[in-house]
Amino acid sequence: MTSLLIGIAQDGGFLGGVDEPVYTFFPEHAGKKWIDRKYPITLAHLLTMSPAIESGDAVESAEAMHRSGDWIGYWLDLDQAGVPGEVAEYSSGPSILLGGVIRSATGKYADEFAEETLFADLHVSSYRWQKAGDGTRETGGGLTLTAYDLAKMGQLVLDKGMWNGKRVVSDTWIAESVRRHLPLAEGALGGSPYTTGFAYHWWNQNYQVDEVTIQAIVARGYGGQYLGIFPTLNTVVVLYNGEWGQPSERVFDYDVIVEKRILPALR
């Protein structure tokens, strides 16, 4: 969702491109390390989850962010720990900051911007978006959608940014945002045995059916939400569950279901 909104913001002229430095969007956070030291971290690094910051365990850092009371400031004050843009490492931080970029560039919070653009065009009205006390939206995983509305997002990507004959997001953004950009960092949270790389907040995955490789663009949500887009099959798959608090490996059960049950039935 966050990736689509960034694309719409860029298409609308609110953003100059993915090479813009992140620190330029947050002048009100002067005093934080990213701002004062002008870290060479760009929007592209956030989109590919490769800012190379010292965030530690992904789950623990997300919990620390929620306790901090300043979600944006929490991430902007972390140390740089490597070279940005080399490997993807799943974390809530880049997504939260991209939500802040949307707010800075458009003057609207992510849900407000979505309501005027993406949600309006796709007729999405039943949703809930978690937010902090200061209004910051939880663009790292705080959005609740119906399965039907999530499927609409997949269909939008499958149709290269078109919805019912209307251009919602540019085909160039869709193509760039779903292609493989980076490998995953060793031991990174969220990657599955089916994962081949990371795009702009999308997982690139391969499934094997009757010795045929089927490529997919995948998004996952905490608790067992799965969105799979299969361009060669012209198909979108959505699975919902509520396995809150389960080991992250349980997420991969859905990949097995897709490979062993759903995809064979579609071929």
Question: At which residue positions do the language-model features occur?
Answer:
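Solvent-exposed loop and edge beta-strand segments that line ligand/cofactor-binding
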Residues: 34-37, 83-90, 138-144, 219, ...
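Structured C-terminal helix/loop/strand segments within mature extracytoplasmic catalytic/sensor domains
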Residues: 219-267
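Active-site helix/loop module of the DD-peptidase/beta-lactamase fold
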Residues: 12-52, 77, 106-141, 145
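Active-site SXXK
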Residues: 1-18, 46, 98-102, 150-156
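Structural helix-adjacent loops and short alpha-helical linkers that scaffold large soluble proteins
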Residues: 13-19, 57-58, 103-115, 161-169, ...
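Flexible, glycine-rich surface segments
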Residues: 120, 125-184
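Active-site-proximal alpha-helical segments within enzyme catalytic domains
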Residues: 94-101, 141-162, 225-242
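Active-site Gly/Thr loop motif
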Residues: 124-127, 178-236
